[in-house]
Amino acid sequence: LHKEYRRQRQMCIRDSLKIVQTNPIPMARGLGSSSACIIAGLLGANRMLGDVLNTQELLTLATAIEGHPDNVAPALLGGLTSSVFEDGVVYSVKRDVDQSLCFAAIVPDYKLLTEAARAALPKQVAHKDAVYNLSRAALVPAAFCEGRHDLLGIATEDKLHQPYRMPLMPGSREVFALAKQCGAKAVYVSGAGSTVMAVAERAEAERFYAGLRAGLETLEGLDGCEAFTLLELDADNTGATVE
């Protein structure tokens, strides 16, 4: 009996699993680092189990963990996504982002925790402000889909969260002005902040990034922000993969 127990025990013992996480996404900066970790964990576990879950099932599970699909959908699917979570079901549409665009993430040296960013929002908003944002929410994907990059600036204007969160983001107004001066088609707060994201034409990328680098040096130390990190980014239309 003892020999059989030992044999069965040996059969159940598997090599230990070592997990090493390398996450280049700055944390607590409004860039979806938590969602990226959720997707990485789910994809890794799914692969180890033999890919038992399909993409829709993974998206639903990730949304249940995160609480909303806003970040996990693009982290999993890539591209530009529009998503709704209703009665436990995620409805999501993805479209590739035009590669003629490039992106700049301007990351300050301070964090803005999601809890603090949410607390800054008012309990109620004016009806006209809600309408203002709804019209732009419809214009953003339309502008991307039709290649109307000239509309991205007005499409990303906001009255529901940026006016309340930017006072918590030292130097953000100056960064907005700098990015527009450097030729950005659109500038907006990434997620809940504290990162500012700017969109430009790839044909102007060299001048755009050079102008940002030079301008950010002059803003360092302004209003309590000691330094900014400039991340030069491309749109990822592939989404999460397991290698």
Description of each model-found segment:
Residues 1-13:
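Single conserved hydrophobic/aromatic residue that forms the stacking wall/gate
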Residues 23-32, 62-69, 123-128:
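A short glycine/serine-rich beta->alpha loop
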Residues 33-55, 76-78:
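DPxDG-like acidic metal-binding loop motif
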Residues 53-101, 167, 173, 187-189:
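Alpha/beta catalytic cores of group-transfer enzymes, especially the acyltransferase/condensing modules
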Residues 105-167:
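Active-site rim beta-loop-alpha module in soluble metabolic enzymes
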Residues 144-243:
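Glycine-rich, charge-dense phosphate/pyrophosphate-binding loop(s)
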